[in-house]
Structure formats: structure tokens, C-alpha cells
From Swiss-Prot:
Name of protein: UDP-N-acetylenolpyruvoylglucosamine reductase
Function: Cell wall formation.
PROSITE patterns the record matches: FAD_PCMH
Pathway assignment: Cell wall biogenesis; peptidoglycan biosynthesis
Family: Belongs to the MurB family.
InterPro entries assigned: FAD-bd_PCMH, FAD-bd_PCMH-like_sf, FAD-bd_PCMH_sub1, FAD-bd_PCMH_sub2, MurB, MurB_C, MurB_C_sf, Oxid_FAD_bind_N
Length: 297
């Protein structure tokens, strides 16, 4: 298992911003995940699980970051017209999207464009165009905080808008999806969503994806745009000119710049509309002796 000290984190997130973490590990199996949990307990430091880093921005952190990128791959069983897909946590979500399009699977293609791992997508209950990844879950295997592998069926787990029981319950190890073939050709709809993503999202700049959750009955992007924040820039970071809810790094952005920008956005939206935006992106930094300070968790 790769295990390092004092590791820079900016290249481990999609926005390419980050400080350093005290310890960093890349486990490849269940035993090594358990060792990471034991290590964090023995040092009395917090542990944070990293997937593809698509909705996470780090400051300087006293703790252990566990990257699950080596836990990847999936296998498929087809039973009576349904696909049961077992995927490890570090599997890129795009690999399953590609499979679902090839097999004409109903609705899963709507999750295209998330640069996330399977475990990360499940942990944040990623969703778009009226579907959430939890809609397709059959069961989840996870490592609890005692280092033991557990299994839970979908109806035993509480998912809601951009929330899941993970990592509170433990570390997602692998999941089983249940897919159903569509009766109609999904390819035109898939291509339409792909065009929308390309036109409306900053695919050519480092980004953390959606910055804020949509308030009930509204859209964060529209509120930010009406508040004059579309294309707004603060030093080396800003909100995309394509989509106001996408935070981008123009090069050399820092964690403190991100925090300042997010605070400005929240203040402006509240002043204009009386709505308090909640972070979807996780901002993680050390907070004295108590370890992590996490916004958007």
C-alpha cells in the first residue's frame, strides 16, 4: 500500500486546488482499508475518504486522506432482462455510463458528466435530470469504522437530496446496481444531454462541479446569476461564464480564495433573495486540535 507523509492535494481534486495533508494512503483491498482505519485511531486523527475529488476542495489538513482509486472494476450479471452490476468504489462513474449506453439501460445515462468515482457518487447521492444514483442501487458493501465489511440493501439506507448515510456509516467498498433495459432507444436522449453539458458547463477549466445545492423550489445557478455572480472572478477563482453555479480555477487558485468567493456568493444571494445557500462542494481544512472543519458535508 502506498503510504506517504505531508502530501500536496491539489492534483488529487478536479479543481486543482489544495493544501497538504499529514498522511495519505492508497489502499488496494479490504485489509488495507482496515489498516488505515486503525492508523487514524492510533494517531487520534480524522480520516477522510477521497474518490475522484470532484466535489472536494482541501486546505491544509491534519489527518489521513484515503484515496480509493486502486479499488476499481466492475462485473455484470444479466438475469431476465435486468443487469446486476457489481462495481468497486474507485471505479470511474463514466465507465458505468459507457456500459449503460452500450446496453441501452434506462435513465442511468442522465448521470453523465460527473467526473466522480462510484463511491463518491454514492456518498453524495449524485443526481441530474430527475434521477439520483440511489435510484439504481440494490445493495452497498461498506467498511464500518471498526474495520469490518458490512452489507446493506437499498431500502435499509436513508438517501435524500445530495445526501447519503456515508461516510457516517463507513467507507463505501463496492456497490451493486440494478439496471433495466429501456424499451426505446436512449441514444438520442444521451446525445442531447451530452450537448447540454458541453454548452453549459466549463469543461475546459478545472472545476469542482456544482458549488451549491438547489434550494427547495429554486435553482442555485439562477439565483447566483440574478445576483450578478455569473462570470464573477475573485483573484484566481470565479464562477463560470457558462454556468453561475460552477466554481472554476483560472490557474493558481487557493483554498482561501475559494472560501472568500463562496462567502461573497452566499451574502449576495441572501441580501437579494433572503435565501441561504448550502454548499454542495465540500471544503475541508484543519480546525485546531479537533481535526476537520467540513462545509457542505
Amino acid at each position: 500500500m502506498l503510504f506517504l507523509k505531508n502530501v500536496p492535494l491539489q492534483n488529487l481534486t478536479t479543481i486543482k486546488i489544495g493544501g497538504r495533508v499529514s498522511f495519505y494512503a492508497e489502499p488496494s483491498d479490504l485489509k488495507e482499508i482496515s489498516l488505515c482505519i486503525d492508523f487514524s485511531k492510533s494517531r487520534d486523527i480524522p480520516l477522510f475518504v477521497l474518490g475522484n475529488g470532484s466535489n472536494t476542495i482541501f486546505g491544509d489538513v491534519r489527518g489521513l486522506v484515503v484515496n480509493l482509486k486502486n479499488l476499481k472494476g466492475f462485473k455484470v450479471k444479466e438475469i431476465k432482462g435486468k443487469f446486476f452490476v457489481e462495481a468497486f468504489s474507485g471505479t470511474p462513474l463514466k465507465d458505468l455510463i459507457r456500459f449503460s449506453v452500450k446496453e441501452n439501460v434506462k435513465s442511468f445515462y442522465k448521470l453523465l458528466g460527473f467526473p466522480a468515482s462510484v463511491g463518491g457518487a454514492v456518498s453524495m447521492n449524485a443526481g441530474a435530470f430527475g434521477v439520483e444514483i440511489s435510484d439504481f442501487l440494490k445493495e452497498v458493501y461498506f467498511v464500518d469504522w471498526e474495520g469490518k465489511l458490512q452489507k446493506a440493501k437499498r431500502d435499509e439506507l436513508n438517501f435524500s437530496y445530495r445526501k447519503s448515510p456515508f461516510p457516517k456509516l463507513g467507507i463505501v467498498f463496492k456497490v451493486v446496481f440494478e439496471f433495466e433495459r429501456s424499451k426505446e432507444n436512449i441514444l438520442p436522449k444521451y446525445e442531447k444531454i451530452r450537448r447540454i453539458r458541453k454548452e453549459k458547463q466549463p469543461i475546459n477549466l478545472p472545476t469542482s462541479g456544482s458549488t451549491f445545492k438547489n434550494p427547495e423550489g429554486n435553482f442555485a445557478g439562477k439565483l447566483l446569476e440574478k445576483a450578478g455572480l455569473k462570470g464573477f472572478r475573485l483573484k484566481n477563482v470565479g464562477f463560470s461564464e457558462k454556468h453561475a453555479n460552477f466554481l472554476v480555477n483560472y490557474g493558481g487558485g487557493t483554498f482561501s480564495e475559494v472560501v472568500d468567493l463562496i462567502n461573497i456568493a452566499k451574502e449576495r444571494v441572501y441580501e437579494n433573495f433572503g435565501i441561504v445557500l448550502e454548499e454542495e462542494v465540500k471544503l475541508i481544512e484543519s480546525s485546531g486540535s479537533d481535526g476537520w472543519k467540513v462545509l457542505g458535508a
